[in-house]
A protein has these predicted regions:
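Acidic, PIN/NYN-like endoribonuclease modules and their adjacent C-terminal/linker elements
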Residues: 1-12, 16-19, 23-24, 37, ...
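Conserved BB-loop
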Residues: 28-40
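Short catalytic-loop micro-motif centered on adjacent basic/acidic residues
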Residues: 31-32, 56, 83
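Acidic, metal-binding active-site segment of PIN/NYN-like and related structure-specific nucleases
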Residues: 42, 50, 54-67
Length: 115
């Protein structure tokens, strides 16, 4: 069965206000804080996002680029990773809304996006 809407998981470095703004627009956004995963490693954060069928949003490009490459080379799937440059929360939320309104969850599988 295909999934239409992307469900987001924001790691601990991403401002929780972004999740609130996305929820106000009707999108499913979960923060590491709300999931009780603030002390989890990057590997654990991505594994959790995968277990929940969520696209990970992070500012940590260096480490998560390595992890997505590892997933690719070991043929592990993920539900997408979105790298966000540090900007005001409203601007990041707006950029995420563009993706959420134009890309399906199925299209986001194993993809990396930069905003």
């Amino acid at each position: 069965m295909s999934d239409f809407f992307i469900r987001l998981y924001l790691d601990e470095d991403v401002n929780v206000m972004i999740a609130d703004l996305l929820k106000a627009s009707g999108f499913d956004s979960l923060t590491a804080r709300d999931a009780g995963r603030l002390s989890a490693s990057d590997e654990e954060q991505l594994a959790y996002a995968v277990s929940q069928k969520r696209t990970l949003v992070t500012h940590n490009r260096t480490d998560f680029e390595e992890l997505t490459q590892l997933y690719f080379h070991t043929e592990q799937m993920h539900y997408g990773v979105i790298f966000a440059v540090r900007r005001p929360p409203q601007e990041i939320a707006q950029r995420l809304l563009v993706i959420l309104n134009q890309v399906t969850a199925d299209e986001m599988e194993n993809q990396v996006r930069y905003i």
